């Protein structure tokens, strides 16, 4: 297998991913703002009622379906987590997490950036009904963070952008582990055994080099159902499925055919407009090049725009809407303070301190081209929690403790906004200072 070719192709995927995520972050922000406006307007009752509307189909007295809110949080977000899983697998095999030397610094940073916010929140809410929300400020929203850092353009070193992306990927992996370990209740082992059986079949398909995505996706639906029924959040099934999707390029004669088509195209006469023959050759090249993509690349290319421009903005619109009126109790335990301090203070301090200590003890080394001041700036941007923080708040606060969920959402919005503004201004002024010195 030509690993160099695969690595180059996956590098191109990363560039496309950055582009879609950065613009997707802006769209995500607009939907969050729209949700807050609608939730505090004259149509707020219709807004909140909409998400409880059941969608599905009925067979006799048996209804198969969910509320619209559950369709978004359990089904559509599973596709988002599938893309995250594909991204993590790609980085582990070919990217910045593919070796200890590459991975150690951002992974250690992600660990510090999760532990510190979690401890701050837990310390403030210990021995209260809200202490279970410690996972809320531990997450980083890669779309928002990338959106901010891309707006800064050339003022930010490329190495810092790569560091932030890799940190966010490692952070996503950590958030998935937190969800699986701490936000799982009433496990049903019969369904877990069923899920394990599906995973074994998926592993067998991978082992047999099955490159068609259809059997993986069909079994993925079955895996989602088993995991959903087991008591573990169904989005974990999507991550497991992602790790079963093959990364190997299909072995056939299409690469030889591509060379022949390229040679034919080069031999055709140069025209201002493409001839019919040239158009047919280019069409054939496109088809054969697409066929040479690995299943992982195909699925990631398909999911990236859907996730960035539909699923995440819809999730934001459905979950960011909080009615800020006299009835909301902002003093529910210390949820507001715990989340805001966790995101705005815990994230940058945790990331900076653990990496600084790690380098001093020669456990890891800082990437070339970025200073400790840059690391601190990236830490502030990592405090933009939003999507994953909102998702965890939905899992942490249910039933009688829904007041805490509303407060947590306000805190996530405020904390993410403060972190984004501080991070952007800090990196902007840091670049300006460096320019003046020159």
UniProtKB/Swiss-Prot annotation:
InterPro entries: Na/H_antiporter_dom_sf, NhaA. One of its GO terms (cellular component) is plasma membrane. It is found in: Cell inner membrane. It comes from the Bacteria. Gene3D superfamilies: Na+/H+ antiporter like domain (1.20.1530.10). It is a multi-pass membrane protein. GO terms for biological process: regulation of pH. The keyword Cell cycle does not apply. It catalyses: Na(+)(in) + 2 H(+)(out) = Na(+)(out) + 2 H(+)(in). GO terms for molecular function: sodium:proton antiporter activity. The chain crosses the membrane at residues 23-43, 62-82, 104-124, 133-153, 162-182, 185-205, 212-232, 302-322, 337-357, 372-392, 410-430. Keywords: Antiport, Cell inner membrane, Cell membrane, Ion transport, Membrane, Sodium, Sodium transport, Transmembrane, Transmembrane helix, Transport. Na(+)/H(+) antiporter that extrudes sodium in exchange for external protons. Belongs to the NhaA Na(+)/H(+) (TC 2.A.33) antiporter family. This is Na(+)/H(+) antiporter NhaA. It comes from Helicobacter acinonychis (strain Sheeba).
């Amino acid at each position: 297998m030509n690993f160099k070719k695969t690595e180059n192709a996956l590098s191109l995927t990363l560039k496309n991913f950055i582009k879609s995520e950065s613009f997707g972050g802006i769209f995500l922000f607009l939907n969050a703002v729209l949700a807050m406006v609608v939730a505090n307007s004259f149509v707020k009752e219709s807004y909140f009622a909409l998400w409880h509307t059941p969608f599905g189909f009925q067979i006799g007295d048996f209804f198969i379906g969910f509320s619209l809110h559950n369709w978004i949080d359990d089904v559509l977000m599973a596709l988002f987590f599938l893309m995250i899983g594909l991204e993590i697998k790609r980085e582990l095999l070919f990217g910045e997490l593919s070796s200890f030397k590459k991975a150690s610094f951002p992974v250690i940073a992600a660990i510090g950036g999760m532990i510190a916010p979690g401890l701050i929140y837990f310390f403030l809410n210990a021995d209260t009904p809200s202490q279970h929300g410690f996972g809320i400020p531990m997450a980083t929203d890669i779309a928002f963070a990338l959106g901010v850092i891309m707006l800064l353009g050339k003022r930010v070193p490329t190495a810092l952008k790569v560091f932030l992306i890799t940190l966010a990927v490692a952070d996503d992996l950590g958030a998935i582990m937190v969800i699986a370990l701490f936000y799982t209740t009433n496990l049903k082992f019969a369904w877990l055994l069923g899920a394990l059986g599906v995973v074994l079949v998926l592993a067998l398909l991978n082992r047999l080099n099955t490159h068609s995505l259809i059997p993986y996706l069909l079994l993925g639906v079955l895996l989602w159902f088993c995991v959903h029924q087991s008591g573990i959040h169904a989005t974990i099934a999507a991550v497991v499925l992602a790790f079963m999707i093959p990364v190997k390029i299909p072995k056939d004669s299409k690469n030889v055919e591509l060379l022949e088509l390229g040679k034919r195209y080069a031999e055709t006469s140069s025209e201002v407009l493409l001839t019919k023959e040239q158009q047919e050759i280019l069409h054939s090249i496109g088809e054969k090049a697409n066929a040479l993509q690995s299943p992982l690349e195909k699925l990631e290319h398909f999911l990236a725009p859907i996730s960035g421009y539909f699923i995440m903005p819809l999730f934001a619109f459905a979950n960011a809407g909080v009615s800020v009126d006299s009835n909301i109790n902002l003093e529910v335990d210390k949820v507001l303070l715990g989340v805001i301090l966790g995101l705005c203070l815990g994230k940058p301090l945790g990331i900076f301190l653990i990496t600084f200590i790690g380098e001093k003890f020669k456990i890891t080394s800082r990437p070339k081209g970025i200073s400790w001041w840059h690391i601190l700036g990236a830490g502030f941007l990592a405090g933009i929690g939003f999507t994953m923080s909102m998702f965890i708040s939905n899992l942490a606060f249910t039933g009688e403790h829904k007041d805490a969920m509303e407060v947590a959402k306000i805190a996530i919005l405020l904390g993410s906004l403060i972190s984004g503004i501080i991070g952007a201004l800090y990196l902007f002024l840091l670049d300006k200072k460096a320019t003046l010195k020159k």
